[in-house]
Curated annotation (Swiss-Prot):
Species of origin: Vitex agnus-castus (Chaste tree)
Gene Ontology terms: cellular component: chloroplast
Name of the protein this chain belongs to: Syn-copalyl diphosphate synthase TPS3, chloroplastic
Cited Gene3D superfamilies: 1.50.10.160, Farnesyl Diphosphate Synthase, Terpene synthase, N-terminal domain
List of residues binding substrate: 248, 472
E.C. no: 5.5.1.14
InterPro entries named in the record: Isoprenoid_synthase_dom_sf, Terpene_synth_N, Terpene_synth_N_sf, Terpene_synthase-like, Terpenoid_cyclase/PrenylTrfase
Pathway as given in its UniProt record: Secondary metabolite biosynthesis; terpenoid biosynthesis
Stretch forming the transit peptide: 1-52
Entry's localization field: Plastid, Chloroplast
The family this protein is said to belong to: Belongs to the terpene synthase family.
């Protein structure tokens, strides 16, 4: 489930700081800090500030939190243990998985998909084009003979769906009987049909295979014409299927069928001799083929066209498919767009996409090349498009910086509803869920995405409440949990490690897709994906646990409890860093994140700082003004924190130098100096987020000069992120038990919620849109990551955050 709840540490006050206005604060003591900053370039910088203690209640010792017991492979927490090359899990196995997946992604071609007995049978029915009394594709007939299941049926051996098994089996029996071969196999197939036909009456109509009510009656008619005995043609369920087809055909506008590509073309083999449609106009229909010669990528429909017209383009398509699948044929082909989109989506959600960046770029470049103003379909160059592939394209292409507009979604909107494609009988959860996911990556003013978000959220919420989540396109036991989590954890509040942990536990290796027959796609559902995800997660988690021990040691050595920082504050800070920047090689950035956030929090909450005047700088460093009679103790506290502060900055610099091989001392000093100056000016809205983001980017090697920090786009991002996070912090400091409920209720009506939403949309646009003015994608992404952690804290209640922390950082992946 989305809550990821197993352990429940008591984080009753996870953000244990108390806001005190500047007018209410008292300053019992001040201490002049005159520090010398020595850089590796031997430059000496003098830094003089006046530091005063605020009279603030220290809540660090209040309450109690039981941290999970952590068992590590290496109990030592030496600096070397924090490096990426530490001896963790089976590196060789990870490399093996990575090679396997790289090879798969690099050889996608038109996509991998399992064979459909139904479509293969239609191809086997094609007579020799030259007029001889032999099959044009004998290898297809051979495939049928070699792939009958032990119970006499044809279909997916591991999963029984009555629609699928009966349709496949009837088609194969018709093909074998037509050519008068393998009578024994035909008899076994007929017996299976006879014994199982009644199961159609109990089958879920939501999972009826595509076009079943159109193509199954056509096959029954063909079987009857061939004189196949033993099939219960007059059974009540059979009569109901024929009646359903008649009702559907009466609603079909004949002129539309021959004018534009519609879903009916996909079931063309079921439209012959339909009274309501009359005779098919083949000269018009042949103009509706795809460039590859198929009818909406259906081998069965294309095989029927070959039988009726001997069209050379259709025949070329069938030849291509049969050669590709050694006599067999899938239910749709190609699936080049679909395979690439869903493979990238799975790799990202499993948290392993960083291993395949070149391959992912190639996949998305390919999809972008075939993007149209109407959207896309599962195969390239198709005039017929659907909302599922179009939504996934919008989301993934936009997240990776491609210039993509969502206006294609207008083609799937009618009145106030969105549909998978024109002519869809009823909507199904999985395409609408992908529409919902795409709708969250919206830019300001994109009304179509706002409408899509509202519709999809309400549609899915209603289905969840009714427990009505059977899907027309996908059979997955994890789909309900996936949808539930998607609604409970909006994209703005989603942290990469939280999403990965959830998806690892819910990734469907055995998911089955529904077409005219059931099919599987190895590039989407592969156990090697899951194996690599688990190995990598364990590796990252072990690294994070080592770092957590290091952070705790820093906490103890620095006596941070004395400055109002509790261990739960520390754990929350580390969790947010590790859940956002999780890669083992980015240890320095995580540690910089935590230490910077803790120190800036102490400085803004418990001290008042201003730059020393010239007269104050001339005073002795030991001068003390005891305003409240407790000066000596205060002086000691201040001096100790100054030592901790500069020592921690030195550690951050040293870690960064080891990681990126650069001296960042000047840059780091400069951003902290600027921030302290602003803090000293008494600004009510302290720009901690700008300081945090700049520290992370500098430690990651993304900022090499001060010019970046003064760049206009960088300043715009800083101002906007500071504003968003300041507003989110105000929400976060409200009544924590009610905040999540109020957020959901008020975000579309209350002004502050609306303002946050609009600002987040603008931030997403600034971060995701490509810019050629010197600000790298890595730099911009850090702003979004930081903003999402604040959104996460404001959105989720403390107990749920505690569950996430336990699950993500401490509980092992099984």
């Amino acid at each position: 489930m989305c809550s990821l709840s197993t352990l429940s540490p008591n984080f009753s006050n996870a953000y244990g700081s108390k806001s005190v206005s500047s007018t209410a604060s008292r300053f019992p003591c001040w201490q002049r800090s005159n520090e010398t900053w020595k850089t590796q370039s031997r430059e000496v910088i003098h830094w003089t500030y006046v530091v005063r203690c605020k009279e603030v209640l220290n809540e660090a010792r209040q309450g109690h939190m039981n941290l999970p017991h952590v068992t590590l492979q290496n109990d030592l927490c030496e600096r070397e243990a924090l490096k990426e090359d530490m001896p963790l899990l089976n590196e060789y196995k990870m490399e093996e998985c990575i090679r396997y997946i790289k090879n798969m992604l690099g050889s996608m071609d038109d996509g991998r998909i399992t064979v459909s007995p139904y479509d293969t049978a239609w191809i086997a029915l094609i007579r020799d084009i030259e007029g001889r009394d032999i099959p044009q594709f004998p290898s297809s007939l051979e495939w049928i003979a070699n792939n009958q299941l032990s119970d006499g049926s044809w279909g997916d051996e591991q999963f029984f769906l009555a629609y699928d098994r009966l349709l496949n089996t009837l088609a194969c029996v018709v093909a074998l009987t037509y050519w008068k071969v393998h009578a024994d196999k035909s008899e076994k197939g007929i017996l299976f049909i006879k014994e199982n036909i009644s199961k159609l009456g109990d089958a879920n109509v939501e999972q009826m295979t595509c076009g079943f009510e159109v193509v199954f009656p056509a096959l029954l008619t063909k079987a009857k014409d061939l004189g196949i005995h033993g099939i219960p043609y007059d059974a009540p369920v059979m009569q109901e299927i024929f009646a359903t087809k008649d009702r559907k055909m009466e609603r079909v506008p004949k002129e539309l069928l021959h004018k534009v590509p519609t879903c009916l073309l996909h079931n063309l083999e079921g439209l012959g001799n339909v009274d309501a449609l009359g005779k098919l106009d083949w000269p018009k229909l042949l103009k509706l083929q795809t460039p590859k010669g198929s009818y909406i990528t259906s081998p069965a429909a294309s095989a029927f066209a070959v039988m009726e017209t001997k069209d050379k383009d259709c025949l070329a398509f069938i030849n291509y498919v049969v050669n590709k699948f050694n006599g067999g044929a899938p239910t749709v082909y190609p699936v080049d767009i679909y395979a690439r989109l869903w493979a990238v989506d799975r790799l990202q959600r499993l948290g392993i996409s960083r291993f395949f960046e070149p391959e992912i770029k190639n996949c998305l470049d390919y999809v972008y090349r075939f993007w149209t103003e109407k959207g896309v379909f599962s195969a390239r160059e198709s005039e017929f498009c659907d909302i599922d592939d179009t939504s996934m394209s919008i989301r993934l292409l936009r997240l990776h910086g491609y210039d993509i507009k969502p206006n294609a979604l207008k083609h799937f909107k009618k009145d106030n509803m969105f549909t998978c494609y024109v002519g869809q009988g009823f909507e199904s959860p999985s395409p609408i869920f992908n529409l919902y996911r795409a709708s969250q990556v919206l830019f300001p003013g994109e009304t179509i995405l706002e409408e899509a978000r509202d519709f999809s959220y309400n549609f899915l919420r209603e289905r969840l409440e009714k427990n009505d989540l059977l899907d027309k396109w996908l059979i997955s036991k994890h789909l309900p949990d996936e949808i539930k989590c998607g609604l409970e954890m909006p994209w703005y509040a989603s942290l990469p490690r939280v999403e990965a942990r959830f998806y690892i536990e819910n990734y469907g290796v055995d998911d089955i897709w529904i077409g005219k027959s059931l099919y599987r796609m190895p590039e989407i559902n592969d156990p090697v994906y899951l194996e690599l995800a688990k190995l990598d997660y364990k590796r990252c988690q072990t690294q994070h646990q080592l770092e957590w021990r290091h952070i705790q040691q820093w906490y103890e050595d620095s006596s941070l409890e004395e400055f109002g920082i509790s261990k739960k504050d520390l754990l929350l800070a580390y969790f947010l860093a590790a859940a956002s920047i999780f890669e083992p090689g980015r240890s320095g950035q995580r540690l910089a994140w935590v230490k910077s956030q803790i120190m800036s929090h102490i400085l803004t909450t418990y001290f008042s700082i201003k730059e020393a005047s010239s007269s104050e700088q001339r005073k002795s460093s030991t001068k003390l003004e005891n305003e409240q009679g407790r000066g000596q103790s205060r002086k000691t506290t201040i001096q100790r924190f100054i030592t901790i502060f500069f020592g921690s900055l030195q550690e951050i610099m040293r870690d960064a130098n080891e990681q990126i091989g650069k001296d960042i001392s000047n840059l780091l000093f400069d951003i902290w100096r600027v921030w302290l100056e602003k803090l000293g000016e008494g600004n009510e809205e302290i720009q901690e987020v700008e300081l945090l983001v700049s520290t992370i980017n500098i430690c990651g090697g993304h900022i090499a000069s001060k010019d970046i920090l003064s760049h206009s786009e960088y300043k715009t991002l800083s101002r906007l992120t500071n504003k968003i996070c300041h507003q989110l912090r105000q929400l976060d400091m409200g009544n924590e038990e009610l905040i999540a409920i109020e957020w959901r209720k008020n975000k579309t009506t209350d002004s502050i919620y609306r303002e946050i939403e609009k600002d987040m949309q603008l931030l997403v646009q600034l971060v995701l849109q490509d810019s050629s003015n010197g600000i790298s994608k890595d730099i911009k992404q850090t702003f979004l990551l930081a903003a999402k952690t604040f959104y996460y804290r404001a959105y989720f209640p403390t107990e749920q955050i505690g569950n996430h922390i336990s699950k993500v950082l401490f509980e092992p992946v099984v």
